[in-house]
């Protein structure tokens, strides 16, 4: 008889093994056999919990997306009554959390983005992630800007976040949080200050 909680432990073990294998060989070559070997289990265990490789890859992406959502939510919770600028900066900080900028996470995200163009289930996850970021930014900018300006500011900052992350992921240098923060902070200030200047 299986121990209580063993299923969730085993699933987490397999997800971590999947992320490690993707980091080593890429998503295309991350076979069930390699993942099972990394996790120290039989191939059948993966089929039992996730049906197939696609099911396991989807679970791995949901795991990273959960970490992203948690990183953002925790920062926003601390700043529940703060001004828009601080909460927008918190959203940026959450997206640049170490859980999203480690070598393993970056390689997994890159592989995920590429695969999402051809796999409907991964594409849906990508759309959910994009909408969540845009919605969060749009709401916070909307506390200080008109609806149209908030939408443009949110789209611009979302593109800036993705662009800074992507450039770092494709470079050989570690992610520079200080540099990314400086660039995004200047953009946030520019958007909010422009509005204030026009109102005065």
Swiss-Prot record:
Gene Ontology biological-process entries: glycine betaine biosynthetic process from choline; negative regulation of DNA-templated transcription
Task of the protein: Repressor involved in the biosynthesis of the osmoprotectant glycine betaine. It represses transcription of the choline transporter BetT and the genes of BetAB involved in the synthesis of glycine betaine.
InterPro entries, alphabetized: BetI_C, DNA-bd_HTH_TetR-type_CS, Homeodomain-like_sf, HTH-type_TetR-like_transc_reg, HTH_TetR, Tet_transcr_reg_TetR-rel_C_sf, Tscrpt_rep_BetI
Molecular function terms from GO: DNA-binding transcription factor activity; transcription cis-regulatory region binding
Domain HTH tetR-type: 8-68
Alphabetic keyword roster: DNA-binding, Repressor, Transcription, Transcription regulation
Gene name for this UniProt entry: betI
Designated name of the protein: HTH-type transcriptional regulator BetI
DNA-binding residues: 31-50
PANTHER family from the UniProt entry: HTH-TYPE TRANSCRIPTIONAL REGULATOR BETI, HTH-TYPE TRANSCRIPTIONAL REGULATOR RUTR
NCBIfam families xrefs: betaine_BetI, PRK00767.1
Taxonomic source organism: Proteus mirabilis (strain HI4320)
Biochemical pathway: Amine and polyamine biosynthesis; betaine biosynthesis via choline pathway [regulation]
Pfam families noted in UniProt: TetR_C_6 (PF13977), TetR_N (PF00440)
UniProt xrefs under HAMAP family: HTH_type_BetI
Entry keyword DNA-binding: yes
């Amino acid at each position: 008889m299986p121990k209580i909680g063993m299923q969730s432990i085993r699933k987490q073990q397999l997800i971590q093994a999947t992320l490690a294998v993707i980091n080593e060989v890429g998503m295309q070559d991350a076979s069930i056999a390699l993942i099972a070997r990394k996790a120290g289990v039989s191939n059948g265990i993966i089929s039992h919990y996730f049906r197939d490789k696609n099911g396991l890859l989807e679970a791995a992406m949901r795991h990273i997306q959960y970490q992203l959502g948690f990183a953002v939510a925790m920062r926003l919770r601390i700043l529940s009554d703060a001004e828009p600028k601080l909460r927008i900066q918190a959203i940026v900080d959450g997206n640049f959390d170490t859980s999203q900028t480690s070598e393993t996470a970056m390689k997994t995200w890159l592989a995920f983005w590429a695969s999402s163009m051809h796999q409907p289930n991964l594409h849906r996850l990508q759309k959910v992630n994009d909408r969540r970021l845009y919605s969060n930014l749009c709401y916070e900018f909307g506390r200080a800007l008109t609806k149209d300006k908030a939408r443009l500011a949110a789209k611009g900052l979302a593109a800036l976040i993705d662009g800074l992350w992507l450039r770092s992921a494709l470079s050989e240098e570690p992610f520079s949080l200080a540099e990314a923060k400086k660039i995004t902070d200047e953009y946030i200030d520019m958007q909010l200050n422009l509005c204030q200047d026009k109102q005065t």
